[in-house]
Swiss-Prot record:
It is an enzyme of class 3 (hydrolase). Keywords: Hydrolase, Metal-binding, Zinc. GO terms for molecular function: 5'-deoxyadenosine deaminase activity; 5'-methylthioadenosine deaminase activity; adenosine deaminase activity; metal ion binding; S-adenosylhomocysteine deaminase activity. This is 5'-deoxyadenosine deaminase. Binds 1 zinc ion per subunit. It comes from the Archaea. Catalyzes the deamination of three SAM-derived enzymatic products, namely 5'-deoxyadenosine, S-adenosyl-L-homocysteine, and 5'-methylthioadenosine, to produce the inosine analogs. Can also deaminate adenosine. The preferred substrate for this enzyme is 5'-deoxyadenosine, but all these substrates are efficiently deaminated. Likely functions in a S-adenosyl-L-methionine (SAM) recycling pathway from S-adenosyl-L-homocysteine (SAH) produced from SAM-dependent methylation reactions. Zn(2+) binds at H59, H61, H207, D296. The gene is dadD. Homotetramer. PANTHER family: AMIDOHYDROLASE-RELATED DOMAIN-CONTAINING PROTEIN, AMINOHYDROLASE SSNA-RELATED. Its EC number is 3.5.4.41, 3.5.4.31, 3.5.4.4, 3.5.4.28. Belongs to the metallo-dependent hydrolases superfamily. MTA/SAH deaminase family.
Length: 428
């Protein structure tokens, strides 16, 4: 049991009581009101601290931490075909594990408590997630390139991943079904992905409408835009869908997104860095679409700090629309907390009694957070993402900025070694 006293919580100075993996009580003077005379009670001084819900990163590729800075300033297809996919061919489970450890640490240290990931060498990712204590939604990223034999192998990998994760019976690790995109996946793979998501009652996670060229490719193959094509065979029906990017959308596609309750993962920094464009978030908001935030992978961002996405998501749409009132600080903050949790069906993202105890504690005695009067504005527009403490599922995983159960230096050392192996193999 954890009691944090006299912290700023939901704009008030009060206490928060965590029991097991839930927020039990929020209020003043809880130590007296709750008769907290227990040996297992850990009391934390919350003075000069603000407590916020843990951030939810709804689209990333965590092991791509080792791709940070290796292929900058390139268009998407050049970036993928000539750099990323060539390097990925040299990955193995150990490299992916080392990269995942680094990525999970980076997310935790910048206040992310849950992430939604699509990649491969899933055992390495699962191991890293378990050791760091972060909450994760994990999918094997399927690409069949319209080849029947490869399709069967990809689907088999997904079934194995889903069933292996479910067998863990770990509430912090959840499976998804994750076909890469319509331009890399056959209709048969996409249809079977939908069937598997329904069968196992897990979310679908996919990239859609990231670039104009990608949309043209799908139109040439199907005579339809991506959302129209997927909707034509029921891909969105009866399942929870998280769609990443959604940069270039027709009015008809926005109608499909709205009517099918598709959750949008907005990745503004990656979209800007790859010059993919700017997603029409204000228009989607007008249509009551659920907007969430993702970082994408470190190869195209180049970090996993969701506070940077929160700031960018608010600023870019003001500048793009010439309207300073669109995407307010509070709305952008909700994208990364409440909305992200809702998209994944997670009882988190808000500091309310009964919610999962995924919380972040930030020291507000910092020059860039003073004066404290408009602290939530500061968290969006002036905070650097360095947090003091992180609690996930009721367990402290970061204390005073340091990982509790992880040797940080060893993680850095192993990541450097794996990067050198990856780079040397790629050069051969």
């Amino acid at each position: 049991m954890i009691l944090i006293q006299d912290a700023t919580i939901n704009n008030k100075v009060q206490d928060i009581l965590i029991e097991k993996n839930k927020i039990k009580k929020i209020g003043k003077n809880l130590i007296q009101k709750e008769n907290l005379n227990r040996k297992d009670l850990k009391i934390i001084d919350g003075k000069n601290k603000i407590i916020i819900p843990g951030l939810v990163n709804t689209h990333t590729h965590t092991p791509m931490t080792l791709f940070r800075g290796v292929a900058d300033d390139l268009p998407l297809m050049d970036w993928l075909n000539n750099y990323i996919w060539k390097m990925e061919a040299n990955l193995n489970e150990k490299i992916v594990y080392d990269a995942t450890m680094l990525g999970c640490m980076e997310m935790i240290k910048s206040g992310t408590t849950t992430f939604n990931d699509m990649y491969f060498y899933m055992n390495g990712i699962i191991k890293g997630v378990q050791e760091t204590g972060i909450r994760a939604y994990l999918g094997y990223g399927m690409i069949d390139l319209f080849d029947e034999e490869k399709r069967e192998n990809e689907l088999k990998e997904t079934v194995n991943t889903v069933e292996n994760i479910q067998k863990l019976n770990n509430p912090k690790i959840n499976p998804t079904v994750s076909p890469h995109a319509p331009y890399t996946c056959s209709m048969e793979l996409l249809q079977e992905s939908h069937n598997l998501a329904k069968k196992y009652n897990v979310p679908l996670h996919i990239h859609l409408n990231e670039t104009i060229d990608e949309i043209k490719t799908v139109e040439e193959m199907t005579n339809k835009r991506p959302f129209e094509y997927l909707d034509s065979f029921g891909f969105f029906n009866g399942v929870k869908v998280i769609s990443a990017h959604n940069v270039h959308l027709s009015n008809k596609e926005i109608e499909i997104i709205k009517n099918k309750n598709i959750a949008i993962s907005h990745n503004p920094i990656s979209n800007l860095k790859l010059a993919s464009g700017i997603a029409p978030i204000p228009k989607l908001m007008e249509n009551t679409v659920l907007i969430t935030l993702g970082t994408d992978g470190c190869g195209s961002n180049n970090n996993l700090n969701l506070f940077e996405e929160i700031k960018m998501a608010s600023l870019i749409h003001k500048g793009n629309s010439l309207n300073p009132t669109v995407v307010s600080a509070s709305q952008s903050f909700e994208f990364a907390t409440k909305n992200g949790a809702n998209a994944l069906g997670l009882n988190a993202g808000e500091l309310v009694e009964g919610a999962l105890a995924d919380v972040v504690i930030i020291d507000i005695n910092k020059p860039y957070l003073i004066p404290n009067e408009n602290i939530y504005s500061h968290l969006v527009y002036s905070f650097n993402g360095v947090v003091d403490m992180v609690i996930i599922d009721g367990e402290i995983v970061l204390n005073n900025g340091k990982m509790v159960n992880i040797n940080e230096e060893k993680v850095y050392e192993n990541a450097e070694k794996s990067y050198n192996k990856l780079l040397n193999n790629s050069d051969e």
